[in-house]
Amino acid sequence: MPSADLPLEECRAYRPELPLPGGFDAFWAGTLGEAPHDGAADKPRYREVDCGLPRIRTYDVSIPGYAGRPVRGWLHMPTGATEPLGCVVEFLGYGRGRGLPHEELMWACAGYAHLVMDTRGQGWSAAAGVTPDTDPGAAGAVPGFLTRGIESPETHYYRRVFTDAVRFVEAMRVHPEVDPARIVVTGVSQGGGIALAVAGLVPGLAGVMPDVPFLCHIARGARIAGLPPYTEIASYLRLHHGRTEQVFRTLSYFDAAHHATRATAPALFSIAMADEICPPSTCFTAYHRYAGRKELRVYEFNGHEGGGAHHRAEQLAWVRDLFTGPPTGRTELS
């Protein structure tokens, strides 16, 4: 597959000016400071389910997210732990739901607690979801989520999703079997963008692992991506002439390249140079702007699948070293 974007050496040097939107920090402080207002339960609920796996305990999770509305997930924990566990909180790719409880077990098998967040309103691709997005979308929105609530940051879909994600991390910080100082967030594509946003919104994380992250330098992605979801924005603007400035202003509050400038936790990025869904220059933008210590794995001949199982092995080693000693992996400086 040919490269879908700038060549690697140009991506390494690519540092566009991305002005932060006005009131960015105040917007997010206000969003996260809002109290739940729909009468939902004010604490997480965990119901153990039998997956037929005696070495792993699995819980059907319901955590109050945006506006206190319940967001579902799975929590996997190794049996027999005698001390608080390190924890990996995972956010999912575009269209994917939490799936079945026995599907994602790698992190629990490695000895960590593993919390998977069901992305509200999603779950039609690869794995089913069960969490609805009850907030109405904007009239005339393109099918998908990038233009849902596009009129303003206050109504946009990802305001709700990012808030849900922060609440999932907060839930693990007070879980009696989790070490609050050893929480890592991760995700692929959309999940990688969410992980970067959480890294900028939640201080004190142990680590961040964004893979081929979506929602980075969104304005560029909308102009050069060959495949969805960024193409949703172009489809919307083909019909709604004169709204370009307003659309990209709204989306700028959810651009992970901005949130990356607020992050401080160590990070392990992956970028695929033949990615037509999340063009590599958009991912490099977030990587270069990331304010914490960072490492990068580049998969020069891969598309949106990224490093696949090879990169999972890189992540396992990185988290092990993060929790038990100084990192030993290859580091690329910005």
Please place each PLM-identified region on the residue numbering.
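Gly/Ser-rich "nucleophile elbow"/oxyanion-hole loop immediately N-terminal to the catalytic nucleophile
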Residues: 144-188
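Hydrolase active-site cap/lid region
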Residues: 196-243, 298
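Cap/lid segment of the alpha/beta-hydrolase catalytic domain
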Residues: 99, 105-106, 112-163
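Short beta-strand element of the alpha/beta-hydrolase
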Residues: 73-77, 83-94, 114
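Histidine-bearing beta->alpha loop at or near hydrolase active sites
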Residues: 293, 298-316
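Acidic catalytic loop of the alpha/beta-hydrolase fold
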Residues: 273-278, 305
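Short beta-strand/loop motif that positions the catalytic acidic residue
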Residues: 263, 269-271, 275
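N-terminal targeting or regulatory segments adjacent to alpha/beta-hydrolase or S9 domains
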Residues: 1-56, 328-334
